[in-house]
Regions:
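A structural motif corresponding to the C-terminal end of an alpha-helix
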Residues: 3-10, 68-75, 105-119, 143, ...
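Residue-level detector of alpha-helical secondary structure
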Residues: 35, 62, 103, 107-110, ...
Length: 233
């Protein structure tokens, strides 16, 4: 912490990842420092599962985030939320995740803190994501329609999982590509210039298309990957 005040003076972007920042005392030290030393050009980013085991922790986190945003202590706060599928399938991927509780917390965050922040769902796209991605996309669109009024408050990203190899999308049977294609079609059907905050953007569609292209070019349903998939799942 000795170097923090010196660094902070010229800091433009600061991101806290996991573990779980809600459970780290240093998160609240950073928040308090920002509250005490407002910086109107700072972009504050935090990655969380949004599923804290203790309601007191959640209350502390939300209260401090609310003060930071509503009292304009920073330029913007981006709350990244790690979720790789929808519902029970997301819970299977991330041990300890309560999907409904997580989504309730996302909506509470957006309701309680209506300015200077956004949510980004980070879906590490893997072979367990494919079959419920449609429902996650539908939920994202629903949240955009509800919360994005003057600027986009609900984002998402689909970076490909590369390791372990047996969890990559590339080891799935070719027939699963049709599911991915249907998801791209759904996004295309809900794109365009009209009502620009409540649609899927071209660059978001392109990310899904790139994932599909990578899948087709690198398909590898090797016996060893199948054995590992079976052993772990």
């Amino acid at each position: 912490w000795k170097w923090w005040p010196t660094l902070y003076k010229n800091l433009k972007h600061f991101r806290m990842t996991g573990g779980e920042p809600m459970m780290d005392v240093n998160t609240y030290k950073v928040f308090q420092y920002i509250i005490d030393h407002p910086k109107d050009d700072l972009h504050l980013n935090v990655t969380s599962n949004m599923c804290p085991p203790d309601e007191k922790l959640k209350a502390k986190y939300f209260n401090m985030a609310q003060e930071i945003c509503m009292q304009e202590k920073v330029e913007h706060m981006m709350q990244f939320v790690s979720v790789d599928a929808f519902g029970k399938r997301a819970e299977y991927i991330r041990d300890g995740l309560d999907f409904n509780y997580m989504m309730d917390n996302v909506e509470e965050f957006l309701d309680r803190i209506p300015s200077r922040n956004s949510i980004t769902f980070i879906c590490t796209y893997n072979n367990l994501s494919i079959t419920s991605m449609d429902k996650l996309l539908e939920k994202i669109l629903e949240l955009r329609k509800r919360y994005s009024k003057t600027y986009q408050r609900v984002w998402f990203d689909v970076p490909l999982l590369r390791q372990p190899a047996w969890q990559q999308i590339t080891m799935l049977p070719e027939s699963y590509q049709a599911i991915h294609e249907d998801n791209i079609k759904y996004m295309q059907d809900n794109s365009g210039e009209h009502n620009g905050l409540h649609i899927f953007k071209d660059f978001e569609i392109q990310k899904m298309q790139r994932n599909l292209a990578y899948w087709r070019e690198n398909a590898d349903a090797s016996t060893q990957n199948k054995k590992n998939f079976y052993a772990f799942f």
